Structures are given as C-alpha cells and as structure tokens.
C-alpha cells in the first residue's frame, strides 16, 4: 500500500538523520573535552591566562576545515552562507575559537540534515506523481522547477528549510553556553553529558517531525497537481486516514470525506493536518467513473457499450485496489 511504502521511506531517512546528529553531538563533546584537557595541562600558566592563549596550530586546522566545508558543492546557498561566517572569523582567545569550532560542527550537521530532507522531499514528489499515474493511467510531465516550487512552498509562514535553520540557531546558542562554562568556570564537559544527550534526542525529534510532516505536504501538493492536470477543475478527491491506534481525532473526522480538488489546501482539508500526519488522498472514484463513462458515451453500440463499461469498471477497480 502506498501509505505503508512512504512510511518506510520516511523511516529510512530518519535513520540517516539520527546518524548525522549522533556524529555531530559526538564531535561537540570531543571538542569540549579536548579544550578542557589543554587548559588542565597548561604548565606554569595561570588558568585565566591559559584560556586566552590561542594555539596557532588550532587556528590553522580550524580554518582549513571551515574552508573545506564551504567548498562542498552539495550544500545549499543558505548552508554555505552560514559556513562562510566561520571561514572569515577572527579569534581573540580560546573561548571564542572553541565557540566557533562548535558552531562550525553544528552548522555542518544541519547542512547535512538539510540535504537529506531536501532529497527526500524531491523523491517523494516523484514517487507520488508516479503512483497517481498508475491509478489514473495518465502521466503528468513536471519540470524540475515545478518540483522545487512544491518542495520549497511555505507551510504556514515559513518553509521547511527556514524552520530547520531556526532550530540550528537554538542548538548553537546552547552549545556556546556550554563552551563558556567549560572555559570560564573550568567545569568538566562530563557534567554536560545529560544535557548533551537531551539535545541529541531533541534535535532528532525536531528534524524527524519536519521531515514527516513536510513529506505529507509535498504528497498533497503533487496529488493536487496531478488531479487537476488529469481530471480537470471539477475533480474531487477523498481524504484517507491511516487507521490504527495512533490515528488522530482530526484525521478520523476527515477520513473518507470528499472535497473539490480546486479547493485542496494542506492543513485545511488535506494532509498534513498536524505534525507527523500519515494521511493521504485518492481521487474520488464515483466522480472519476462518471466522467470516464460520460466521455465515451455514444461511441459504441448499446450492446458493446455495456460490455465496455463493465470491462472498464473492472479495470479501474483492479487498478485502485492494487495501488498501481
């Protein structure tokens, strides 16, 4: 079934997000430990003085890493703009350098998450159009610019990329606060392990919610495009909720309800109705069949027309049942 296959696709991307976030958090903790160790082993130097001394080698390594990230052509313009901030920064002391190193790690982690979400949403649009073509027997040729427009449409006041980078800003501020505690108060990074683990779970949850919810939105946008192109302005669609113990009240309420395609709006009368929404839509069968037979009326003898109607009806039913 289409809903189940899309759920599996979502799960695969969530696993990739979990890996990226785990590596990002591990790098953050590793850098905190490394800086704490350097301060703890500074011989003959007062703690307050040690934290001010910037190792030229550390700066050089950081600049090389920042430059390498900026030159990554896979990242978006927004990601590269964020990364360039670290490539041109000045470093007055160890605390500032540490904050920039951690900020670079966080930014790179979110750039990689953005890539995963972007590719998943584009693939979701393509799969949805292919699925609709299997049901209705008609392809819609969509330009890459149309796919991109669907993927980056606003849902509410912001699009998914803007929401993702807002989440990055929040995590970066939290990490910088931890860095200040390590550098200014000499607190061991181990004290922050519970908080770091909490941030890891929260980061995964935020991106997962964004990915699944936006996947439902682009499915709806792609379905609407296909319905209008193949069935016309008077076409209708049926809201289909995934029925189980997790199904929300609002999706249960809308399940099996029929609406005009021209009035189709995600979050209003089409998925997603809420975060993590798993509902979808299908063309309204009764409406489609009526049009299907009306277009062919009078083209055949009465006897043959009856045979044709039965054959066509059986063919459509099989296609809908099999999800082709």
Where are the regions that the model predicts?
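Activation/maturation switch segments at domain boundaries
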Residues: 1-119, 199, 212-324
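Structured, charged N-terminal subsegments at the starts of enzyme catalytic cores
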Residues: 82-197
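Short, basic interhelical loop/turn and adjoining N-cap
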Residues: 199-206
């Amino acid at each position: 079934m289409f809903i189940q296959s899309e759920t599996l696709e979502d799960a695969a991307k969530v696993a990739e997000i979990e890996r990226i976030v785990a590596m990002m958090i591990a790098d953050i903790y590793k850098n905190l430990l490394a800086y704490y160790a350097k301060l703890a082993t500074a011989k003959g130097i007062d703690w307050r003085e040690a934290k001010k001394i910037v190792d030229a080698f550390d700066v050089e390594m950081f600049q090389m890493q920042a430059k390498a990230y900026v030159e990554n052509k896979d990242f978006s313009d927004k990601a590269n703009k964020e990364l360039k901030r670290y490539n041109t920064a000045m470093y007055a002391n160890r605390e500032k350098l540490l904050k920039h190193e951690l900020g670079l790690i966080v930014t790179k982690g979110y750039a990689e998450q953005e890539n995963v979400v972007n590719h998943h949403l584009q693939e979701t649009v393509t799969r949805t159009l292919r699925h609709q073509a299997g049901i209705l027997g008609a392809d819609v040729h969509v330009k890459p610019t149309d796919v991109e427009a669907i993927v980056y449409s606003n849902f509410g006041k912001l699009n998914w990329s803007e929401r993702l980078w807002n989440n990055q800003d929040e995590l970066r501020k939290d990490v910088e606060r931890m860095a200040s505690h390590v550098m200014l108060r000499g607190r061991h990074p181990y004290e922050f392990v519970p908080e770091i683990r909490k941030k890891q779970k929260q980061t995964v949850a935020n991106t997962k919610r964004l990915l699944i919810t936006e996947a439902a939105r682009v499915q709806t946008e792609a379905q609407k495009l296909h319905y209008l192109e193949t069935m016309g302005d008077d076409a209708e669609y049926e809201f289909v909720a995934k029925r189980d113990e997790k199904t929300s009240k609002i999706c249960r309420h809308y399940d099996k309800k029929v609406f005009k395609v021209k009035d189709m709006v995600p979050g209003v009368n089409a998925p997603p109705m809420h975060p993590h929404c798993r509902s979808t839509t299908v063309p309204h069968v009764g409406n489609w069949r009526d049009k299907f037979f009306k277009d062919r009326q009078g083209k055949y003898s009465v006897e043959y027309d009856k045979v044709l109607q039965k054959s066509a009806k059986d063919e459509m039913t099989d296609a809908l049942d099999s999800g082709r």
